[in-house]
């Protein structure tokens, strides 16, 4: 859920990035519009990718694309075609992640039942919701602290170099760090390979 809340927090920080780094706060609507359209369209192709490559690999692909998209935006220099490319890449990445994340959560419920004999949908879903809220809370707190340390002044005509750096840290580098952590965690996720056998065993028990 940390990955999901990191993605959510990115949207909160976009206004700072668009206004002070890209130089036009109105770019937020363009960035979000392209991102959302691509993400929605991408959802229609995820089932096909999951069938061929598995949930873990598609989710990991989404994280990699999110990282690439953030880096492309970071080095866009406000050049609109590159910003569009970044939004497309991140839209595809979020489609991969959003479509597979909850499916993997559902798989862990089946795994828990197979391992312990108890099916705990409520507990698992509550834990996910709690983790999402905690992640959002931490992200919002970090945003305020880092901007304050960087000397960000909301109504300033121009921000200092340290303030601009703090915005980049919040909008680009912290989400990238979370995505990298997600990739590391996925290295230890092997349920895709075992899941058919687990479902067959559960069916046999019932």
What are these language model-derived features?
Residues 42-55:
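Helix-to-loop junctions at the C-terminal end of transmembrane segments
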Residues 145-177:
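A membrane-interface helix-boundary motif in multi-pass transporters
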Residues 65-78:
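C-terminal ends and interior cores of transmembrane alpha-helices
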Residues 12-27:
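Short amphipathic helix-loop junctions that connect adjacent transmembrane helices
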Residues 36-40, 44, 137:
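Residue-level signature of mid-helix packing/kink "hotspots" within the transmembrane helices
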Residues 1-7, 11:
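Single conserved hydrophobic/aromatic residue that forms the stacking wall/gate
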Residues 81-98:
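Hydrophobic core of transmembrane alpha-helices in multi-pass small-molecule transporters
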Residues 189-206:
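Intrinsic disorder in cytosolic terminal tails and internal cytosolic loops
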């Amino acid at each position: 859920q940390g990955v999901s809340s990191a993605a959510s927090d990115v949207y909160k920080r976009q206004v700072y990035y668009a206004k002070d780094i890209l130089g036009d706060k109105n770019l937020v609507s363009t960035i979000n519009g392209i991102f959302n359209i691509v993400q929605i369209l991408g959802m229609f192709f995820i089932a096909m990718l999951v069938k061929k490559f598995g949930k873990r690999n598609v989710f990991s692909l989404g994280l990699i694309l999110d990282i690439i998209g953030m880096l492309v935006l970071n080095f866009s220099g406000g050049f609109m075609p590159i910003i569009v490319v970044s939004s497309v890449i991140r839209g595809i990445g979020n489609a991969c992640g959003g479509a597979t994340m909850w499916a993997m959560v559902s798989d862990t419920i089946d795994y828990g039942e197979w391992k312990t004999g108890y099916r705990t949908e409520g507990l698992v879903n509550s834990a996910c919701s709690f983790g999402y809220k905690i992640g959002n809370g931490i992200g919002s707190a970090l945003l305020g602290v880092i901007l304050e340390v960087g000397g960000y002044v909301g109504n300033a005509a121009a921000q200092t170099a340290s303030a601009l750096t703090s915005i980049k840290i919040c909008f680009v580098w912290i989400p990238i760090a979370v995505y990298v952590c997600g990739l590391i965690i996925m290295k230890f996720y092997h349920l895709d390979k075992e899941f058919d056998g687990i479902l067959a065993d559960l069916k046999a028990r019932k």
